[in-house]
Amino acid sequence: MQREEVTELIVLQKIRKQLSWAQLAEVIGQSKEWSTAAMLGQMTLTRAQAEAVGTALELPQEAIALLQVPPYKGSLPTAVPTDPLIYRFYELVSVYGTTFKALIHEEFGDGIMSAIDFNMDLTREPDPKGDRVRIVMSGKFLPYKTY
C-alpha cells in the first residue's frame, strides 16, 4: 500500500461513514486544519492518533502504520493546479506573493515565514452578499543568518 492509497481510503471511508473533517479532528485531538492536512498525506500522526483515526475509519493496520511515517510534504503536482479552488490559492500567491514578501521583509527583515512552526484557522464569515471564507495563517518568522 502506498501513502496516496491511504489518502484515497481515508476519503472513501469518511464519505461512507458520513463524517466531517472536524469530527475526525476531534478523534485525533488536533485542529481540523492540521488533522485534515495529516489525513490528506501532508503531516505525520503519532501512534495514538493513527490508531484512533484508524479505528474511527476502520483502516487496515498497514494504513495505520503509513500514517506514522513522515510524508513527502508539498507533494502536489508542480504544474499549475487545475482544481478551481486550489488554483485560486495559486492565483493569490501569483498576484500577492511579491506584496507578502515586501511587507514581511519591511516588518521583520530578510527571512521567511515558517510553514513548520505554523498555525491556520479556517472559518465561515457571514456576509449579506454571500458568506466569506476566512483563513488566518500564523507562521514563525525565521531570519536568514549570516556566516
Curated annotation (Swiss-Prot):
Enzyme class: lyase
Keyword Lyase: yes
Cross-referenced InterPro entries: Cyanase, Cyanate_lyase_C, Cyanate_lyase_C_sf, CYNS_N, Lambda_DNA-bd_dom_sf
Source domain of life: Bacteria
EC number: 4.2.1.104
Gene Ontology molecular functions: cyanate hydratase activity; DNA binding
Pfam family, one: Cyanate_lyase
Gene3D superfamilies: Cyanate lyase, C-terminal domain, lambda repressor-like DNA-binding domains
NCBIfam families: cynS (TIGR00673), PRK02866.1 (NF002773)
Family, similarity comment: Belongs to the cyanase family.
The protein's role, per its UniProt record: Catalyzes the reaction of cyanate with bicarbonate to produce ammonia and carbon dioxide.
The protein, known as: Cyanate hydratase
Species, as recorded: Ralstonia pickettii (strain 12J)
Gene: cynS
